[in-house]
Amino acid sequence: MWWFYRKGPSGFAGASTAEEVTAGIDGRGLVAVITGASRGIGRETARVLALRGVRVVMAVRDVSAGARAKEAIQAEIRGGAELDVLQLDLSSMASVRRFAAEFASLNLPLNILINNAGVMARDCTRSCDGLELHFATNHIGHFLLTNLLLENMKITCRDSGVEGRIVNVSSAGHIMTYAEGICFDKVLDPSGFNSFIAYGQSKLANILHTNELSRILKDEGVNISANTVHPGIIATSLFRNRTIVSALMNTVGRIISRSIEQGAATTCYVAMHPQVQGITGKYFGNCNIANPSSQAVDAELAKKLWNFSLQNCLGVIFVKKSKFSKRPENLRRSFLENMKNTCAKIHQRGWASGPQALPPPPPRGGGQACGAHTALPHPISAL
């Protein structure tokens, strides 16, 4: 276990805690959105950022759990802590859009976005948008959320002169994926489902998303960094749906896992520490720059994933669940393929070369998949 305490170039190690890596940092005047902030490392990240003076918007699936976490954090921090709790179900694109609209109604700037929430399911499950659940929750939901909040971040960093930071929480588990890295067919048709591979694919997608986003932001000359972190092996509620894994983690946890306070350290370091200023498109572990798999640095795969994700976020707004779900499986798949091809043509015409340059949404009447679409005051409202 000596490696756990060995400090890297940053001066920190795997044994460092979130409070230690942010000691002396003044976050007053900053606003952060943290997904999955009601428990685990998300909650600890929210607590430590609030401790440093950051106003934290806790994006949570369970509002009651979020409210309890908020109360506990505020009771602990002397002088109070600025915390808001908003509902967000990352498996539903409609919920992501509602969250973005609710956040916009707060009229807050946005300096830091931490895409922390994740799920590891035991069974093969589709999201309400028809996507494999790991991919929908761990990647697509965060992809859409990031794009919907990005214009706010651009305005904030421009007006304040302070670098914006996007932190995507991935995992060393990204190495457990398909031979081709991302098997796009499995996202729409998860036959032969393997939960570990599905999870690994979604975590690989987190890194690829980060890298492509970083490239786009650099090309635009925007002062926003995007980095990925591996929090380490932690016995968190991520495994609550996997009884065997939970038992295993409880058995060997004291040997191989780290505490919640240590698990949140790398996220807090990348989100707040001055050492990370100007660093973007990197993968961090143990509060230091680390090396992900070769697939994770595949620029062409990152572009393919970006286009695929964009097409799915655009395509779902045309679907009425009440009618679509009643169609035969072959017709549903044909419809999705046609929609993907249409969106690909839009992309080729240059309308969607970046996360901000999208066409206006088409006129719609009635409902849509997973709920009603709420128009957002951003140029990217087509998402």
Regions found by a protein language model. Give the residues of each.
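C-terminal tail/cap regions
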Residues: 1-20, 246, 274-343, 383
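Rossmann-fold NAD(P)H-dependent dehydrogenase/reductase core
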Residues: 3-5, 10-244, 313-330, 343, ...
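Alpha-helical packing segments of well-folded alpha/beta enzyme cores
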Residues: 69, 99, 209, 263-267, ...
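C-terminal helical subdomain
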Residues: 96, 202, 228, 251-292, ...
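Low-complexity, intrinsically disordered or signal/transmembrane-proximal segments
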Residues: 347-348, 356, 368, 373, ...
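Intrinsically disordered, low-complexity proline-rich regions
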Residues: 359-363
